[in-house]
Amino acid sequence: MRVRSIVCGVTLGAGAAFIGRAALRTTEGPAVDGELFALVNAGRGPLADGLLGGVTELGSLYAAAAAAAALAISGRRRAAASALAAATGAWLLGQGAKKLVVRPRPHDANPHGTRMVIARPKGSSWPSSHPAVLTAFTHVAARELRLGTASRVGLAALDVSVASSRVYLGVHYPSDVASGLLMGRAVARLWPGSRRLDG
């Protein structure tokens, strides 16, 4: 089971790197990424702006710390510690990748074609750390808590919602968040100390 987790983790990490390379280094990648970004970033009105502005914060380390505190208070300290540590690991990995791959944010690359809903973050656009942090947290927590399929599907939907919000709000390209999702999943698969269950 541990070997399988390592293979899956490495494969997911390679997938994240492949998406980033395709978006940055191929002829068609930037154009496709830009078109998808424009489609999602177009906006759906003030209600959607406010809702997704709140949803996106669920991918922050602060939100992970708050969720871990809630788990610890409820007596699930192992799950809290493992999930928060994995989320922190995903954040550190993402920040390290940003130093290696410097990609301008959408607004920097196209100021007049980007609808900014929130303040522009600093640093490279690739990869997106918010989905990486949340995905690492939710997957490790789900294994530690032995959550069922329905709960895991709900958490996966939350991961994707946060990832999509980053594009909608104008701070990341689709390939940035796709890589972030895979990066978070890779960290979760490789994270030691989790009760490893299939599914």
Question: Model-flagged regions — what are they?
Answer:
Residues 1-63, 95-123:
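N-terminal transmembrane-helix/juxtamembrane module of multi-pass inner/ER membrane proteins
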Residues 85-101, 151-165:
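Small-polar-interrupted transmembrane alpha-helices in polytopic inner-membrane proteins
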Residues 10, 14, 83, 87-91, ...:
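Alpha-helical transmembrane spans of integral membrane proteins, capturing the lipid-embedded, hydrophobic core
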Residues 8, 78-84, 149-153, 174-175:
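Short, aromatic-rich membrane-interface segments at the entry and exit
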Residues 111-199:
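Membrane-embedded catalytic cores of phosphoryl/pyrophosphoryl-handling enzymes
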Residues 17-30, 72-77, 94-103, 143-146, ...:
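Short hydrophobic alpha-helical membrane-entry/anchor segments
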Residues 47-48, 76-79, 107, 147-151:
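Membrane-helix interface segments
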Residues 4, 69-93:
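Interfacial segments of alpha-helical transmembrane regions
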